[in-house]
């Protein structure tokens, strides 16, 4: 089975093209148009070309003399073209590029009406491919339905081809509109054309209906500059009468476009006075200061009005100081006020938040130097005459010669002249203990023996060894009736002191010996042995005195045992 398509009669019939153009114009204006197109779309030229489409029969469902139904595969790559004409809006503020909401977009009054530009579009180089269902009947005409989207590509040429963005936009929009046209509008257009050809009743019915007048041309455009507004005003806002407007001309020196409408001036005033938020015609709110208008000067004035914010610098300087617990045990004469001293042991807390004002006041304030009340008991560099201060401070004694022995020093050999006395030793200051202070307050007299002149001789090897092994520095004697040289400090180690205390207790059990002196020693003993015996007698007498004071209960109270203990030895001489 074969079919013969005669494409040339369609090209030769002038009435066919006219009817097809009218139907295409109605179909293009039926669907909603994009906002950039502000006028109707008119089909000014239509040509089917000389190349017919290619059809391939896939299925034949019904075949008779007056009807046919079948499925075809169609492909078209001919030279048909279509020319459209319309007008588009050239206002850039009202185009497809706007993506923000309308309430947030400014709408200047100068471009509210929009500028329209004529646009001519030519569609050519159609590429179609799809499946077509064809139904033919002499009583009902021809019905063509596309099962898929047949449009593959086409070429769009317009007056804005020099602008790439507009060209691409028109290409996309027209392709979308043609796809809708092929699927929805083209089958209806073909059906109506077939009815005119084969159904005489439809042709007579259509001839009785008057055709609607379609404007062929729009004529010359009106010059908006020569048509003043209804309520014209000049640049100063003064209303103009009709006589003044009539007297104006293009040659009068006053241009017509300087006339503004009073309504437009009011809108411009509202635009100027608006807060520039949301819509431009938002009514202003009284007694409201927007944050965009508040600067540093306004913030400074707000802070000086008497209302302090929580983070203001004035509050960040408020601090509370907590002193260390050790400061309560210090001497009252050496403790300074907390406001004049800042130490590392003190903890400071902010008065309003822990981090307010941190790092602003890092420089420490100048403070007074803390006084140190320390008595220097060490040696003096210059040898002076020693002075002994009694407990009551009544008198002083000076010793001309006093011998001091130390375990760390070895005595040098003396000169050949045994008469020459050595230099006076350094001063040894000994503060009386509390026992001596109490005994002085009770009226006890402490006898001071005059200084005893000692001469050195060449010591023997055994005596020197004994002296070095048992160091016995001299101490003042605090016993009654004992003639001992003053300013001789006796310092024992812990092991020697314990052994001597035991021996002293044994001697005190037999009774005190107040008559003990250095004269009891053998005359043949050496001078060093006599000095050592004198020191031992002084220590025994002092221990006896302390025991007697404890028996007499001179120190009542819970601290008497602590007070009665032997005071620590003085600094090394």
UniProtKB/Swiss-Prot annotation:
Name the segments for region: Disordered: 301-326, 349-433, 499-521, 550-573
- Amino acid composition bias (Low complexity), ranges on this chain: 306-316, 396-409
Give me the stretches of Basic residues compositional bias: 360-373
The organism sits in which domain of life? Eukaryota
An example GO CC term for this entry is:
ERMES complex
Using the record's annotation, list all stretches that form the SMP-LTD domain. Answer: 1-195
Q: Keywords in UniProt for this one?
A: Lipid transport, Lipid-binding, Membrane, Mitochondrion, Mitochondrion outer membrane, Transmembrane, Transmembrane beta strand, Transport
Q: Where is the composition biased (Basic and acidic residues)?
A: 374-385
User: CDD domains under this entry?
Assistant: SMP_Mdm34 (cd21673)
Q: Which InterPro entries match?
A: Mdm34, SMP_LBD
One of the GO biological process terms: mitochondrion-endoplasmic reticulum membrane tethering
Subcellular localization: Mitochondrion outer membrane
| Membrane association type | Multi-pass membrane protein
GO MF terms, alphabetically ordered: lipid binding
Query: What note about domains is in the entry?
Result: Lacks alpha-helical transmembrane segments, suggesting that it resides in the membrane via beta-sheet conformations similar to those predicted for other outer membrane proteins and porin.
Q: Which PANTHER family match?
A: MITOCHONDRIAL DISTRIBUTION AND MORPHOLOGY PROTEIN 34
Whom does it interact with, and what assembly results? Component of the ER-mitochondria encounter structure (ERMES) or MDM complex, composed of MMM1, MDM10, MDM12 and MDM34.
Tell me which family the UniProt entry assigns to this protein: Belongs to the MDM34 family.
What this protein is called in its record is Mitochondrial distribution and morphology protein 34
């Amino acid at each position: 089975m074969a079919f013969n398509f005669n494409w040339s009669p369609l090209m030769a019939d002038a009435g066919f093209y006219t009817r097809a153009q009218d139907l295409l114009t109605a179909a293009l204006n039926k669907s909603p148009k994009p906002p950039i197109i502000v006028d109707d779309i008119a089909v000014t030229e239509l040509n089917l070309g000389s190349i017919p489409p290619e059809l391939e029969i896939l299925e034949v469902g019904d075949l008779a003399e007056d009807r046919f139904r079948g499925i075809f595969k169609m492909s078209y790559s001919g030279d048909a073209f279509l020319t459209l004409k319309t007008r588009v809006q050239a206002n850039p503020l009202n185009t497809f590029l706007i993506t923000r909401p309308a309430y947030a977009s400014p709408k200047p009054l100068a471009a509210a009406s929009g500028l329209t530009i004529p646009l001519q579009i030519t569609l050519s180089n159609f590429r179609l491919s799809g499946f077509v269902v064809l139904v033919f009947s002499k009583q009902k005409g021809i019905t063509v339905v596309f099962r898929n989207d047949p449009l593959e590509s086409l070429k769009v040429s317009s007056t804005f081809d020099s602008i790439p963005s507009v060209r691409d936009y028109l290409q996309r929009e027209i392709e979308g509109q043609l796809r809708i046209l092929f699927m929805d509008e083209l089958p209806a257009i073909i059906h109506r054309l077939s009815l005119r050809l084969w159904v005489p009743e439809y042709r007579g019915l259509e001839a009785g209906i008057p055709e609607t007048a379609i404007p062929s041309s729009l004529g010359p455009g009106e010059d908006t500059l020569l048509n003043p507004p209804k309520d014209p005003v000049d640049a100063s806002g003064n209303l103009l009468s009709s006589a003044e407007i009539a007297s104006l001309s293009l040659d009068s020196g006053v241009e017509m476009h300087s006339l503004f409408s009073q309504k437009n001036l009011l809108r411009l005033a509202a635009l100027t006075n608006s807060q520039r938020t949301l819509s431009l015609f938002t009514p202003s709110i009284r007694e409201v200061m927007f944050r965009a208008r508040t600067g540093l000067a306004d913030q400074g004035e707000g802070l000086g009005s008497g209302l302090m914010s929580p983070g203001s610098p004035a509050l960040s300087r408020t601090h509370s100081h907590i002193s260390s617990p050790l400061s309560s045990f210090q001497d009252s004469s050496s403790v300074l006020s907390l406001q004049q001293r800042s130490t590392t042991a003190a903890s400071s807390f902010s008065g309003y938040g822990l981090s307010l004002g941190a790092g602003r006041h890092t420089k420490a304030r100048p403070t007074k130097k803390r006084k140190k009340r320390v008595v220097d008991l060490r040696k003096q560099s210059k040898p002076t005459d020693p002075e002994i201060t009694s407990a009551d401070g009544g008198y002083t004694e000076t010793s001309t010669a006093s011998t001091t022995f130390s375990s760390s020093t070895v005595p040098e050999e003396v000169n050949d002249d045994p008469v020459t006395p050595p230099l006076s030793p350094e001063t040894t200051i000994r503060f009386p203990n509390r026992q001596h202070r109490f005994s002085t307050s009770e009226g006890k007299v402490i006898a001071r023996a005059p200084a005893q002149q000692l001469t050195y001789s060449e010591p023997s090897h055994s005596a020197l060894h004994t002296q070095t092994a048992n160091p016995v520095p001299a101490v003042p004697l605090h016993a009654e009736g004992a003639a001992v040289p003053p300013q001789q400090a006796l310092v024992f180690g812990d092991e020697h002191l314990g052994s001597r205390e035991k021996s002293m207790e044994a001697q005190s059990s037999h009774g005190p010996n107040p008559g003990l002196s250095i004269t009891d020693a053998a005359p043949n003993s050496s001078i060093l042995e006599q000095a050592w015996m004198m020191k031992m007698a002084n220590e025994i007498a002092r221990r006896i005195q302390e025991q007697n004071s404890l028996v007499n209960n001179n120190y009542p109270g819970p601290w008497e045992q602590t007070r009665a203990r032997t005071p620590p030895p003085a600094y090394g001489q």
